[in-house]
Structure formats: C-alpha cells, structure tokens
Amino acid sequence: MAKRPRTSEEDDDFQYADHDYEISQQRSLKKICNRVKWTRDEDEKLKKLVEQNGTDDWAFIASHLQNRSDFQCQHRWQKVLNPELIKGPWTKEEDQRVIELVQKYGPKRWSLIAKHLKGRIGKQCRERWHNHLNPEVKKSSWTEAEDRVIYEAHKRLGNRWAEIAKLLPGRTDNSIKNHWNSTMRRKVEQEGYLQDGTKSSSERTGSSTLAQKPCVTMEHLHTQNQFYIPVQTHIPVYQYASPEDSCIEHASASANLVQQSFIDDDPDKEKKIKELELLLMSTENEIRRKRLSSQAGSLPGWSGSFVMEDCVPNTLNSLGEQTSEFYSMDETQGTSVQQNSPTKYLAVEANAVLSSLQTIPEFAETLELIESDPLAWSDVTSFDLSEAVASPVKPAPLKLMRIQHNERAAECQFNVSVMLDGKKHSSISGEEEAVFPTTPNLTKYSTPPAILRKKKRLRAGQSPVNELNDGLCNDAINVALKHTPVKTLPFSPSQFFNTCSGNEQFNLENPAFTSTPICGQKVLITTPLHKETTPTDQKENAGFRTPTIRRSLLGSTPRTPTPFKNALAAQEKKYGPLKLTSQPLAFLEEDIREVLKEETGTDIFLKEEDDSVYKSCKQEHNSSKKVRKSLVLDAWEKEELGAQLFTEDSGLDVQSENAYTTSLLMIPLLEIHDNRCNLPSENQDTNSSNKANAVIKKKLNACSSKNIKLEKSLQPNYEWEAVVYGKTEDQLIMTEQARRYLNAYTATSNTSRALIL
C-alpha cells in the first residue's frame, strides 16, 4: 500500500525547530517520548486536562497522557487545539500588520511577530509572508521556460523543492510544489509536455500565432480607433536597419547561444547572463555606429518600412519595460521601395529571441502581459500622444495623410483628411499615400498628472506655428547627428484643427504641426515669421465654445480655510466635540434688541445717551422694587409703567388716574367687592398713592431734563395687555376660584384681613 503524504498539520507536529522560541527547549530534550500522530482520544483528553488545570503546569498534564512529554502537550495545544487560534483566511488588516512587523523585526523572528497578532502563530505568519506578502515573490503566470527548469530539476533532484526554488528567483518552494502537483505532473506524464516531439510543434504554434497577431491588430486599429497606422504589433525584438549582413549572423548566433545556455541546467547561469548582456550591448553599439555612418552618407534615402528599436543604453534591464517606436517615411516619387532604400533589416527570428528572453525573470512578466492582450497594447488611443501639452478640447481623430514631395526639396506640401463630427472632410492632393506619423510614446504607460500637462499661455501676437518653426527647422539641420529622423508629437490635434483650414498649403517657412519636413535643405531662421491669424471673435465656432470660468467664481458661499479646518479637526480629535458656552445676559440683551429692531423697524426700548444719568435714576427706582411681596402691582410700579407708555407731556392728573385705574385692574374682584365698605381706608391709600405719584413725577422731570428720551408706543399690543391685566381665560378662572375661596373665608370670620405691603 502506498504511503499517504503528510498534511501540513502533521508536518507541524514533527518540525519543532521552525520556531525560534522552541530551540532552547529542544536542546535540553535528549529524547522525544513518542513521535506518533496524535489520536482523537488524546486530543479530547488534552482539552479536558487544560480546561481543568490551565496552561501553567504542562508536566502535570503530561503525566496523565501516556508516552507524551510536557513539550509535546504544550506544542499540540498552542499550535493545534487552542480554540483562540484563527485558521481562516487572512484579512487586509492582518496582512498590513505582518508587513509592518517584518519591516521592524526582520523576516526571521516569527514568534515575536506572532505575539502582535492575536490568534496567529509563527508558522502562519512565516508562510503568509513567504508565499504571499513578500514583494520579491512573483505572482504572474508560469512560463514555458520556468516549466522546463522545474522539469529538468525534478528529474535530477526529485521533491527537493527548496533546492529547485534556488534555480527560479522570485518563486517559492511552496508555489513550485503546488504548480508541479496541480498542473505540471499531469501534463508531463499524460500529455507528453516538454518532450522532444511537442517542442517543435509548440514552437510552430507560437510562430503561427505571432504571424497572425499583426493582421488582427490592423483590423482593430482601422475599424475601432479610426487610425490608419500600419505598425507591426508583435512583441518587440531587435530590428535594426543596417547594410551589413554580418550583423544578422552575429545576432542570430548570440540568440542561439542564449537559447542553448538556458535550456541546459547550468549552475553558471548568472555568469552567462552577464556575458549575454555584454554581447548584446556590443552588437547594438556596432549596429548604431554603422547605421549613423550610412545615414550621414545618404540622408534623403530613408527606410520605407517601419522599424522598431530599443533606444535605451542598458538593453538587458529595460527591454521589457521601455519601448520607443520610431517611424520613418519613404520618398514617394513613383519609384519602388528597393530603389530608394538600399538598407537591409536585421530581423532576428522571433521564437529564438523570445524563448531566450523568457528565461530571464525580468522579461517574462512583461512579455506575458503583451501576449495576453495584444489588442489593448496595440490600441494607440490608450496612450498619451503628447507629454507636455494637454488639449483643452477633445482631439478629432485623424484618418489618412498624403505627402507630396518635390524633387528639389524646396517645398513639402501636407494635406490631411480628418473626421470631424462624424463627417469626412477631404482635402487630399497627390498620387502616393503615406502614413500620418502619429508616433505614440510608449515609454510611459500612464498619463502624467494634469499639473505637468498644463499648456503655457501664448504671448500676445504669437501663434503656435511661430513657436514650432525654430524647433522643426533645427531638427532638420541636426538630423544627421540623431539616430531617428522623426520626433514625438509636440502638439495637441485640436490645436492643429483650430489653426489650419482644410486647403492650407505648408512649406519650409510655414511647416506643419505633425512631423519633421522630409527634406534635406538646411535653413536658418533668425526672425520668427508671424502668420496671419483670424481674430477669435470672427471664427466660425466662436459662439459655440464654452467660456472659461474660474473655479473661484463658481462658489459664492464663504468657505472655511483649509488650515482652520485642520486646526478645528485636531482640536475635536484631542478634546472632543466643541460645546456652545452660555453668554452673559448683557450680550443676549443686545442681540435680542438687534433682532427686534430688524424685524419691527423701530427700537421699542429706551435709547440711552447719557449712561451715568440713566444709572443714577435706575438706582433710585430699584430701591422701591425690592419691597414687592404680592401679586398686586403697587402704585410706584404702575407710575413707572405709565411713564414708559405715555409721553412726558401728559399732566399729573392723567398719570395719577391711569396709575389708580391700572392698580384696580390687577386687584381681585372679590377683594374689591369686600372692601367697598372700607372707603376711608381706600381714600387714605389713594392719598398716599397721589403723594407717591407726585414724588415720582418730580424724579421723572429731573431725568427728562438730562436728555433721556422716551419713545411712543405706536400701536398697543392687546394680547400683551390681556396677559398683563389678567384678562386671559385661565387667569379669569383663577380669579373666580380665588373669589369663591375668599367668600367662604369671610363668611366664617367677621374680622377683615388687612393687606400688608
């Protein structure tokens, strides 16, 4: 019977030295009592013993288990049976915590790291880091070159996955083991994967797919993107235009050397990689030197095909990451391409180079991304056509361009056919077609930030054409010193359409926006040539443009400054939410007066001009207010109320009568009825009130002589008077109840009760 493979839980029982906090205990142990797998009965018994005795005395617990040491019991409980252990999937917070702890303590102190993660042990943290969180671990799909290395190494080493992992940097032993057991072993044993017979067929299949990809991509570009750019969209390889045949043989031999060196399981792999790097760099320099010399000899005779080359000096490290495409155009004068372009092309076989480059980990991931979705990588619209200029409006798609080149290179006429608003506006002249050189810059696969792409405003009286004149002509002069005759687009297509009409002719003095003129004439322009431009208000689409609006003018509401927001947030975070404190009554009184003045339009309160005089008068009145003990308002208060409600021109008799009547209104009806017989006492009270009114009148006259102004009450508030005079419904009910109570009281006792103020 075949031996059953051990699970990860069983491996955990045997590999004690995986945890650094257990090494000292293992050294003290001379003999492990029983290394047999724990049974279910032993696990249940250990759980009960731990529940009864705790986790402090493992020697006592081990005495109840046969052939188990205290260390074995502790290890089994802490690593397997503890219910607090978390064996589920890792959360994002746990992953982030592991990354921070590894940066702090290093990737070896897993027991210390596990103490900061509740429910996780050191082995879990170690496996999580090495298999998933380590940034050096490759998570891309497996390549055929990696499969071949695993296949050859497994034939020699067997299941020694740690040794095999050393041959594949970026792959862990666990991932290699899982890949072999899940996929590779079945394909090798049943389908004959990586055998000699299937190798040639796989190469033929790869070459056929590489040959088919450009056609699919061309249809996609022509139909979907409205760009007609016949660019080879297969995986970029070294293709240089060189007149020497020896370079082709030299590069082919180097590719064969690379392929042979990586097929064999050679321990000197790194040394051969360095030799390959030097070989490729020397080949590249030689090709460039010969190409520059040929360009200096025959400058007008440029290549009639599209050449892709790598312009980065360090070719080995940047081939898969940075790829620049340079397009060159032919002089279309009715002659064939072979007559004008004597150059030959270095076209290394695609499979030879790809199979060698895929064995290098730096290139495998990038090549897989390109192979997985060729349509997306060949989609020119997904890349930014200009790095330094951002178009304010959406650029119109370009369709086709024809170039008519003169024999003397005196004029270069450019006419374009564009797609505007779904309609084709054609202005094509000439007989031969050439491609509009919209060169995508593929060295950066992301659009730069908007701050870096903002367009500088043009100075007054200067057009975009004038700025481009010097640069384009200088490029035509210095083209012999560069390795490419065409530069990337320095403009926005909308800028081209806004300044150029459909039938406009261009020459060397007034060049186009799109490319370097195809001519060898050297012209020095010292004075910028101003072009006659149409004023903005006379343009056809001037009324349909969206006006530029500053963002600061859009929001009319006041906004809290950012520093104040930050300070307020910090205060709330530190001291809690802010609370409103009670204001003094003086401030509240002022606020109420302002609100009432805004609503009513008049100030119903006293307007003070001399505060000292008003305070002196107020102090004299306050002494009499302190003796108020009952609900009945005394005559002094009524006199003061009458002084506020009426003008100071009224006579003494009117005020005294008013004070007397208002005082009677506030007295309960029962008390008035009972005291009718006591007229002498009432007369005495009236006399005393008259005397008091006379005294108050003198004081009011003194205050009025010191410019204290009293405002008239324009309209009496009847609701307020009803409340004050006790005429509301509830007040009348209370008054009636009080009258009945006093009637019953006076019926029992004949003696009258005097009101003491």
Swiss-Prot record:
The lineage's top-level taxon is Eukaryota
Q: What does the UniProt entry say about where the protein is found?
A: Nucleus
Region span, Negative regulatory domain: 303-558
Tell me if Glycoprotein is a UniProt keyword of this record.
no
In which tissues or organs does this protein occur? Expressed ubiquitously.
DNA binding happens at which residues? Answer: 58-81, 110-133, 161-184
Q: What is one GO biological process annotated to this record?
A: positive regulation of transcription by RNA polymerase II
Sequence ranges assigned to domain HTH myb-type in this UniProt record = 30-81, 82-137, 138-188
Q: What does the UniProt keyword field contain?
A: Activator, DNA-binding, Nucleus, Repeat, Transcription, Transcription regulation
State what this protein does.
Answer: Strong transcriptional activator; DNA-binding protein that specifically recognize the sequence 5'-YAAC[GT]G-3'. Could have a role in the proliferation and/or differentiation of neurogenic, spermatogenic and B-lymphoid cells.
Q: What is this protein's name?
A: Myb-related protein A
- UniProt organism field: Gallus gallus (Chicken)
Lineage of the native species?
A: Eukaryota, Metazoa, Chordata, Craniata, Vertebrata
